[in-house]
Amino acid sequence: MQTDAPGDIPAPTPSPDHRAARPARSRRTTRPGGGPSLLAPGAARDPYRLYRVLREEHPLSYDAPLGAWLISRYDDVVTALTGPEFTGFPHDGAPRGGPAPLGLCHGSTGCLPRDRYTVVTGFVPRRLAERVERTAYVLARRIAGRRQADLVEEFCHWLPAGTGPFRSPLRTGDAAPADEGPCTRHTGLRETALASFLANLLDDPDLLAALRVEPTLAGRAWTESMRRDPPVQVVLRRTLTEVTLSGGTLPARAPVACLIGSAVRDPERFAAPDVFDPFRRDQADATTGPAGCPAVVLGRLEAEQGLRALLDAMPRLRWADGFRPAATGLLTRGPRSLLVRPG
């Protein structure tokens, strides 16, 4: 496993680790540039052990097989996603301060406020909301009479696909809709996020019972699922200038892999980060994507309406006998199958 810095990119300058004094963070340090590779065997099957090693021992390291610097701590990742010293990768012409492809957002500039107008945050056209609800109930009722079903194949795939196009109005009153972009055309991330959301809830029968009584809790459960199990695990960025992070200083024009899946499990930011807890006080707000992105808005709506339809059609919904969900993937991650007993 290659651990040296590449010949054409200078090694980072070590900087004091301001986290080292905290008990939760290991005091061990290694030479910047050394560390395990994101492409190591087994990383896609269980990346969280690798993430922990990177956060504690190699917060800034160059991954030669990947060809990028790895950053894994929450504060560092948020800096790379939002700071003006970073831009999109590999397109250096991406707008500064533009949204990174994060959460359910593909990074479309249409997801940002503009000088002429502002996208209505959290707004869903009434007809679209009705179509999401109708599609969710049709799919749920098709599954309800079966002895066993796969929610990924028979529900999570079809609900986002059946939602149709999203055209957001403009807050200024301009009648022209916002342009469609990749966030509205592509549904794969919403499918993956919905599958992780349902897996987290089915793993907790008590929480599922609480949601039957109080459906409004679904919003908090969705936010927590997006934190604990984000569909996009790695986002690539590029530095515009030298940038100092907790593990050292990155050179200008350096490719950087932001390990979202590691950042959202950082114990310096989240208490008991591996636990799915919709009632936590420290819910994530910086790694879910722009609030005005249509994919972000639709994903939440599909999760809330989809869960309600499933519970209405199948009050005794539970895992199939002997089944345990398993997430897979490195760049994007989620369960590929959710076998359930509808009744």
Task: List the model feature ranges, each with a label.
Residues 1-343:
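Cytochrome P450
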